[in-house]
Design a protein with these regions (language model features):
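Active-site rim/loop-helix segments in enzyme catalytic domains that contact anionic ligands
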Residues: 1-95, 224, 235-236
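Metal-dependent de-N-acetylase/amidase catalytic core
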Residues: 2-6, 82-238
Length: 238
């Protein structure tokens, strides 16, 4: 299956928190979008691997994406080496996305920066013909995405561009709340974590509101790029 956009997250819920409004918008425009989670979040303080698997499946259904995979890398301990790069390369060649979106370049959680660099490096390597990979016994064609973008997570990073998600904020919120084990609930006996504080989900709204304010819309998501953003004409900019 060829995808238009492939989004990566170090953990289940990274993509939802960072760019699910943009994903929902692209799906509504007829684009085929997939999500690949690097780990199952097994080191997370709250919930369990099994619960998070179920939550990820529910979030995927809410977003209407075409495919979701988990690479089962070690939470907290995966590294940017040949073995891990090859796992990413195989998926890039399998789905042949034009656009790849991945974790923030740097962030509070060490896996976010690591995952970002791992995916970015794999996107480049995936275009090298002398790196040979197979899928279901068939040699894969080389493929390099046209662009790699990074969503913004815990740290307040200055975006290179923002996407208007005003009509999709409700879907973004629903996809985030699909991960009920990870966020604040009065009925939960689980420990409080940085993302399980009472106001965390509200802070996501505030950020999207602020990005939206800067471009004159209700809600927006910010991204950073690895190269200049090109437009065909000034009319493409709003």
């Amino acid at each position: 299956m060829k995808l238009d956009i492939l989004a990566f997250g170090a953990h289940p819920d990274d993509v939802e928190l960072g760019c699910s409004g943009t994903i929902a918008k692209e799906v509504s425009l007829g684009k085929k979008v997939g999500i690949i989670d690097l780990t199952r979040g097994e080191l997370g303080t709250r919930g369990s691997v099994e619960i998070r698997d179920q939550e990820a499946a529910l979030a995927a259904e809410i977003l209407g994406i075409s495919v979701r995979e988990n690479l089962n890398m070690r939470d907290g301990f995966f590294v940017n080496d040949e073995a891990h790069q090859l796992e990413i390369i195989k998926r890039i060649r399998k789905y042949q996305p034009e656009i790849v979106i991945c974790n923030a370049i740097e962030d509070r959680h060490i896996d976010h920066g690591k995952g970002s660099k791992l995916v970015s490096d794999a996107c480049f390597l995936s275009g090298l013909r002398k790196i040979e990979t197979e899928h279901e016994g068939v040699q894969q064609e080389v493929w390099r995405p046209k662009v790699v973008y990074h969503y913004i997570q815990w740290k307040n990073i200055e975006p290179d561009f923002v996407v208007d998600i005003s009509e999709f904020m409700d879907i973004k919120t629903k996809s985030i709340l699909a991960y009920a084990s990870q966020f604040y609930s009065e009925n939960s006996n689980e420990p409080i974590t940085p993302i399980a504080t009472k106001n965390f989900v509200q802070s996501i709204h505030y950020r999207t509101q602020d990005f939206g304010r800067l471009i004159g819309v209700d809600y927006a998501e910010g991204f950073t790029t690895e190269r200049y953003v090109a437009v065909k004409s000034l009319g493409d900019l709003i």
